[in-house]
C-alpha cells in the first residue's frame, strides 16, 4: 500500500452501507487521504483511530436500535477529534449521545429539499434551501441535549446537527453526486479536521515503485497483464522497480472480445512490456463445460488462471505475482467484514488460497480514476487509459448459463458490433462501458416467411465515474436501432435485442 493512516488522514468507519467507499473517494478528491475500517472489527478500529485526524461514520442498511454499533461510536467520540455522521452514522451519534431516533413521519428516498436553520461550520456558504439525496426510514426526532439543529426536511426534523464544534451529523448523503453542495459540506468539515491536503495519486509513482522494490527484493516476479489500464499500470510500476526481473504474462483464455489479444500484445510491446504469451483456451473451455452459475464460473476461471500462471511462473522461476487489483475489486468481493459479497472478483476472490506465488498489489487502495492519473504519469497511451474495462473472466460472464463454443462466437460478434457502432457514433470516450450479453432467454422471431426461435442479446451501456455507481447511457434511438439491426442480420441465431436501462445500484454493471 502506497500510503496508510500512519500519517494524518480521515478514517471512514463502515457500517455496511453501499456508499462507504464513495465517502472515502470524495474525501480523496478534496486532497485528503482516507481509508476504511469495518465497524464490526473493534480491534482494527481501535488500532486505526489514534492515527486519524478525523472520522466519518458511514451509512448502513439497518436501524440503530437493532445494531451492535454503540461501542464503535463511543470509541470514536472518546477520541476527541472531528466526527461526521452520515445517514445511519448521523442517527447513531444522536442515539449514543441521548437524542431520540425513531420511524420518520415521512420516509425519504431520492431528491429532497433541505431547509437550513443555522449554518454553523458545516453549512457555511450554502444557500438556505437546496436538494439532497435521502435514503432513510428512520430519522433523528429529537437532538441530543447539547446539539444545535442545523437543518430539517419534512421527514427529518433534525436533518443536520452540530455538537461542541467538532461533532456533526447529516441525514442526507453528501458523497452522492445527486446531492447539491455535497462537496462543499465535506470541504467545510475537512477544513475543521485540518488534515494535510497532500493526496495526489498522480504524483505517487516513485513511492509505489519503492514499495514494490522493497517488497520483491532480489526475487523474480510475473505480472498478470490483460491489456487493461489496471494491470498495465501495476506492471509498469513493477518494471520500474525490478527491471528485467519482471516477466509480464498474458494468458489467452479464449474468452477475450474480438481482436483483443492482438490489440493488447501490440500496446504492451509499445510500453516495453513484451509479454510471455500462454495459449490456454482449450484448458479454460474444458474446465467451464457445463458450469452455469456465475460465481462458479468466476471461481473456475480464477482457479485455472492461477494454475496456468503458476506453471508459467515456475518455468520462469518467479516467486511473486504482480496484480492490478484496485479498490472496487476488493469491495465487490466482500473483502471487508460485515459486507455482503456482490460478486467474486477474478483478481481477488477467484484465486485459490493455497496459491504458491506471493501477491503484490500496488494499486489495491486506488480507485479507477486515480489509476488513470498514474497511467498518464507513466506515459500510457490515451487509448489504453480510457479503454473500457473488461471483466477478468472475459466473455464467460457475458454469457448467461453454461458456455459453449457457439455461444462464445455469438456474444463475441455481438459485442464487437456494439463496440463498432458506439465508437463510430463518437460516444466511446463518453461512456464507462458498453458491451453485449448473450442472455439465457430464447424468443420467437420471423426469418423470411417462417417462424424462428433464437437467442436474445442484451446491450448494456453505462456512464460512471468510479464504477461504484453507474447509470444507463441514453443512447440515441437511431443508434440502438442500428445495433439491433446489425446483430439480428449478421448473427442469424439471434432474433431479439434488448437494451438494459438499470442503474447500479440496484444492479451491477456486468450481468454476471
UniProtKB/Swiss-Prot annotation:
GO terms for cellular component: cytosol. Residues 9-198 form the Glutamine amidotransferase type-1 domain. Its EC number is 6.3.5.2. PROSITE patterns: GATASE_TYPE_1, GMPS_ATP_PPASE. It catalyses: XMP + L-glutamine + ATP + H2O = GMP + L-glutamate + AMP + diphosphate + 2 H(+). CDD domains: GATase1_GMP_Synthase, GMP_synthase_C. Catalyzes the synthesis of GMP from XMP. This is GMP synthase [glutamine-hydrolyzing]. It comes from Aeropyrum pernix (strain ATCC 700893 / DSM 11879 / JCM 9820 / NBRC 100138 / K1).
